[in-house]
Amino acid sequence: MAKEKFERNKPHVNVGTIGHVDHGKTTLTAALTRVCSEVFGSARVDFDKIDSAPEEKARGITINTAHVEYDSNIRHYAHVDCPGHADYVKNMITGAAQMDGAILVCSAADGPMPQTREHILLSRQVGVPYIVVFLNKADMVDDAELLELVEMEVRDLLSTYDFPGDDTPIIIGSALMALNGEDTNELGTSAVKKLVETLDTYIPEPVRAIDRPFLMPIEDVFSISGRGTVVTGRVERGIVKIQEEIEIVGLRPTTKTTCTGVEMFRKLLDEGRAGENCGVLLRGTKRDEVERGQVLAKPGTIKPHTKFEAEVYVLSKEEGGRHTPFFKGYRPQFYFRTTDVTGSCELPEGVEMVMPGDNIKMVVTLIKPIAMEDGLRFAIREGGRTVGAGVVAKIIE
């Protein structure tokens, strides 16, 4: 069979299911592919195939994730579903599958449970911008008051973690009914259709990397006689054009310079775009004034910081991480984009030690500033070996 052509005509949005174990995340994922295949003509994926998610590695961490795709009238959705709670934690912290919005699945029969809370907290920490709620298993609840109660609990929980609980769309339905093609009381197919329409309207179209302000992590620095200093790297976002003023941020005091040339595969270009590996020629900058680990950026768009709150996952022994716990005063290297910087960890009150396999909130103080913003991912290393993964949740100074 010929490979299907990838249609690029609809905006692409990344979503995923989150919520407590056995509340119906995978069933809903399968139901979404079924309903969308019938209504909008995308391919359906069976429950078993999603449930036996393949292992993948992200930054040396093994994560089980299922990826499915479906279409609405106006969008193409890429959807991630994880079989186990630990997979969610790793997935969200490493940013292996970044979400533009999440579908929180909560069983109407059970109400919010510990992982419901933890996934909402993680979404806040790692910067998932929007959450839509699907109150599942509603066919098992006869009491309308009970449904209202669960809905109120979920809204309160969202508000606790700074999501707009009162304005969050909540769809009531049964994923299993939709998966079986049933629709009693509009709880099956209709509810899932309504969910897709809600994703279309409630989650805004993400800003593409190319439309965001220019940023390029510096990987290497060369001096070309007669032409000046060239820094190379992969443009993370935005576009850099010749004669534009750019800032060099991180590790040292921020300096301004001008881009006097862009080259790619030894060809001269007039701009470098998101996703491209290129060399940028800097006017009047000396070879020893820039180094790996700094970034080039559009002036004023990113600042250097040393202290931040992070959400961290500590690799287990089986994943090649530490064999022993660490304690307060732990000083590993934090690997941001292209370089390691030493930093110290301050653990939350009442936490004495952190075990391999845990996830934890900590405050990190680096010995040198790094160009940083909320949502930036990093690795924690000891002597070049990765022992953890983290994300900047909040910048302190």
Swiss-Prot record:
Chief subcellular location: cytoplasm
Binding site for GTP: 19-26, 81-85, 136-139
GO molecular function (one): GTPase activity
Region of interest called G5, as start-end residue ranges on this chain: 174-176
Domain called tr-type G: residue spans: 10-207
Ranges for region G2: 60-64
Residues given in the record as Mg(2+) binding sites: 26
EC number(s) reported in the record: 3.6.5.3
Region (G3): 81-84
Coiled coil (residue ranges): none
One of the record's GO cellular component terms: cytosol
EC supergroup of this enzyme: hydrolase
Region listing for G4, in residue ranges: 136-139
Biological function: GTP hydrolase that promotes the GTP-dependent binding of aminoacyl-tRNA to the A-site of ribosomes during protein biosynthesis.
Subunit structure: Monomer.
Record-given protein name: Elongation factor Tu
Taxonomic path: Bacteria, Pseudomonadati, Pseudomonadota, Gammaproteobacteria, Pseudomonadales
